């Protein structure tokens, strides 16, 4: 089996993570006590990817939960699936990181990281053939961003050949929690560029927009947002957990096909069909054409970046449900032909699709979309501008230098993010003719 160890850091990461476990436990027929109550062999066929079977036949998530304060852990434990997790895998401090990246990365987090790594090692050792790690965290706070990136770099040292995948919640342009979000985000991106293999970017504001516009909710709660994120996380990982016609694992399907240049591994995610919770009956009449159409719709993207402002380097569509491969291929070709200007022409076959036979609960079919679009630079550019505005005046810098950080680190992180933006821009503007010119120049020397 190709197992995945799932880590969740900080308040946001733990809330998204625990929602994700609720969704996939439900899909695999595992009840809140960890015993199997399902009705299909397909649920058990690859259940070991995320669950470890204990001696008594209970299924225990391969999950590592960490935070620098006990509050979130208590609420996860008290939640509906709190008894599912292995009690030793809750690792928490008492002090909190106070939205300070330096505390999470250098001081408080560094004290706790060894016990987290011990649990990760234990989980990795119980795997037959570890495929990689996934981390859910936010980049705006202190623990998820600082300690989350610390964990990634430590795991990178210890397991250099395993895939590292992150679900990263990026601060929104209009919805801001703390004033130092731009600092925390930039310092985190600086780490993710170097140490993660694929980062799925999620944005609260885009999630709010989906709730208002598409789902017609008047007062969306964080529960609703987490529900959306969990649906996408479940969709991204479904072809690893269930048998299907065109199946895949993290490395082949996602990392190899979606990352044309190693630094450009920040993806947008989308999901279809998105209908409000009440209108179940409408969902049954969906066709492959409908969901494909909806999937490429800018309103369904979970990031505050508009794919129409950029171009797709690569994309992957993960269909779920009973459908023919031929129909899927036709629809995907159809989309590419109609909107050819949005796809980069110098990467051949840059849209991949896979089909997993088992649809999510309550739907006949669904599709999850992962796109590597150059428009994600808008997000980095926005954070970069906020960062520069604060850093130029050295606002709040003493919080970080007081924890032993150096101003040089800020300058490095800033320039790394600016480089990332210009790399995206460069590939967005590149055309086939230019590629030809480069060859001629090389021959001339």
Curated annotation (Swiss-Prot):
Entries under InterPro entries matching the protein = Beta-tubulin_BS (IPR013838), Beta_tubulin (IPR002453), Tub_FtsZ_C (IPR008280), Tubulin (IPR000217), Tubulin/FtsZ-like_C (IPR037103), Tubulin/FtsZ_2-layer-sand-dom (IPR018316), Tubulin/FtsZ_GTPase_sf (IPR036525), Tubulin_C (IPR023123)
GO molecular function terms listed in the Swiss-Prot or TrEMBL record: GTP binding; GTPase activity; metal ion binding; structural constituent of cytoskeleton
One Pfam family, please name it. Answer: Tubulin
Query: Which cofactor does this sequence's record say it needs?
Result: Mg(2+)
**Gene Ontology annotations for the cellular component aspect, listed alphabetically:** cytoplasm; microtubule
Residues engaged in binding Mg(2+) = 69
Q: Where in the cell is it found?
A: Cytoplasm, Cytoskeleton
Question: What does the record list as GO biological process?
Answer: microtubule-based process
User: Which keywords appear in this protein's UniProt record, sorted alphabetically?
Assistant: Cytoplasm, Cytoskeleton, GTP-binding, Magnesium, Metal-binding, Microtubule, Nucleotide-binding
- List positions binding GTP: 11, 69, 138, 142-144, 204, 226
General function of this protein = Tubulin is the major constituent of microtubules, a cylinder consisting of laterally associated linear protofilaments composed of alpha- and beta-tubulin heterodimers. Microtubules grow by the addition of GTP-tubulin dimers to the microtubule end, where a stabilizing cap forms. Below the cap, tubulin dimers are in GDP-bound state, owing to GTPase activity of alpha-tubulin.
Name the family the entry cites. Answer: Belongs to the tubulin family.
Its assembly, as annotated, is: Dimer of alpha and beta chains. A typical microtubule is a hollow water-filled tube with an outer diameter of 25 nm and an inner diameter of 15 nM. Alpha-beta heterodimers associate head-to-tail to form protofilaments running lengthwise along the microtubule wall with the beta-tubulin subunit facing the microtubule plus end conferring a structural polarity. Microtubules usually have 13 protofilaments but different protofilament numbers can be found in some organisms and specialized cells.
- What is this protein's record name? Tubulin beta chain
């Amino acid at each position: 089996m190709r197992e995945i160890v799932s880590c969740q850091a900080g308040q946001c990461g733990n809330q998204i993570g625990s929602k994700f476990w609720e969704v996939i436990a439900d899909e695999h027929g595992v009840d809140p006590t960890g015993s199997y109550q399902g009705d299909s062999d397909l649920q058990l066929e690859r259940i070991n990817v995320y669950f470890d079977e204990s001696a008594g036949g209970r299924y225990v998530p391969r999950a590592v939960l960490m935070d620098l304060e006990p509050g979130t852990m208590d609420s996860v434990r008290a939640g509906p699936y709190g008894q599912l997790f292995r009690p030793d895998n809750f690792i928490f401090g008492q002090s909190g990181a106070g939205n300070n990246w330096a505390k999470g990365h250098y001081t408080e987090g560094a004290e706790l990281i060894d016990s987290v790594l011990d649990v990760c090692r234990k989980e990795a050792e119980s795997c037959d053939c570890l495929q990689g790690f996934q981390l859910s965290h936010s980049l705006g706070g202190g623990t998820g961003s600082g300690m989350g990136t610390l964990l990634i770099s430590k795991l990178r040292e210890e397991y250099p050949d395993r895939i590292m995948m992150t679900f990263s919640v990026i601060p929104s342009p209009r919805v801001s929690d703390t004033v130092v979000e731009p600092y925390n985000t930039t310092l985190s991106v600086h780490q993710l560029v170097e140490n993660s293999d694929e980062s799925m970017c999620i944005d609260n504001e885009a999630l709010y927009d989906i709730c208002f516009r598409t789902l017609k909710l008047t007062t969306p709660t964080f529960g609703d947002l987490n529900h959306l994120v969990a649906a996408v996380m479940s969709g991204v990982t479904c072809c690893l957990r269930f048998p299907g016609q065109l199946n895949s694992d993290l490395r082949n399907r996602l990392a190899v096909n979606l990352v044309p240049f190693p630094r450009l591994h920040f993806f947008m995610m989308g999901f279809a069909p998105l209908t409000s919770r009440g209108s179940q009956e409408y969902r049954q009449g969906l066709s492959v054409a409908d969901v494909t159409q909806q999937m490429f719709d800018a309103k369904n993207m979970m990031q505050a970046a508009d794919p129409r402002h950029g171009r797709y380097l690569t994309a992957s569509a993960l269909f779920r449900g009973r459908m023919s491969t031929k129909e899927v291929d036709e629809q995907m070709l159809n989309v590419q032909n109609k909107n050819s200007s949005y796809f980069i022409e110098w990467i051949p076959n840059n849209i991949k699709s896979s089909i997993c036979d088992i649809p999510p609960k309550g739907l006949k079919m669904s599709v999850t979309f992962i796109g590597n679009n150059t428009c994600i630079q808008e997000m980095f550019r926005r954070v970069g501008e906020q960062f520069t505005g604060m850093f130029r005046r050295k606002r709040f810098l003493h919080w970080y230098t007081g924890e032993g950080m150096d101003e040089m680190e800020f300058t490095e992180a800033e320039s790394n993010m600016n480089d990332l933006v210009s790399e995206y821009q460069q590939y967005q503007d590149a055309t086939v003719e230019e590629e030809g010119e480069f060859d001629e120049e090389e021959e001339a020397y």
